[in-house]
Amino acid sequence: MTLQPQMEEQLIETDKTIEEYKVDEPEDIFEKDDEKVAIILKDYYASAAPFMFHYFPDNFEEIAQDYSKIFWDFLSSDAIKKSVFDLHVQIHQNKYDVRGKMKNKSIKMYGIEDLSKEEFLAVAIHEFAHFVDIYYFQKKVIRDLSENFYGISWESTKVMQAGLKQSDFVSWYAMTNKYEDFAESFTYYVLHNKDFLQKAEKSEILMKKYKYFWVYFFKKDDFKQQDFSIENEVLDYYRDITKIPFDIENLLQYLKKWI
């Protein structure tokens, strides 16, 4: 992902075909049948293939291990590993014009020596959310559950539904297109769940997004009411969820109970 304003006009690099779908009305997305679909989907991937890490250049592995280990722990936790299959994580020493991106089942992280471990993990989780969106919820498996999320706020890829406000999105970056809305909301749910829920109590749209991840992806108590934020104040506006400070040690301790 990137923080540059000009990226408003760019979409996530992905091989997913962009097309118009007939989506469920938002108020219908939490019906009993949909919850059964989510359970079936979780079972379908229960024995999914693992993930692999790759380093560029090859001799960068030793230097990067402290970074890759924290993302490894995240992917290995019971809350997450059910959705991981055939995933490749590339750790690059060199910088690029973005900190991370996801394409073709590969998450690529760039210039990590210039990132704190907290920012590295937040960006990696954001990119993993794109993997969940594009591949775990892929259309050919039962049906594309991502469309239920898009239908909450979006008419098409970059066209919002009428009447929506800034407060109906978790960040400025989430407002750029439906894919970034999904990834930013996923990251917010994992790292700042209590914060997310507090805001959702003031926005029906945000509450639907919060409940979407609660119903379709996470078990009922995974991350719920957890908050790894360092600052207690809940801000009205965030530009980028990956820039919000959080306590990485508390997060890793929370994940370890599932590893």
Task: Describe every region a protein language model picked out.
Residues 80-259:
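Active-site-flanking segments in enzyme catalytic domains
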Residues 1-62, 188, 211, 217, ...:
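N-terminal low-structure segments adjacent to metalloprotease catalytic domains
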Residues 39-107:
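Auxiliary, metal-adjacent structural segments of Zn-dependent hydrolase domains
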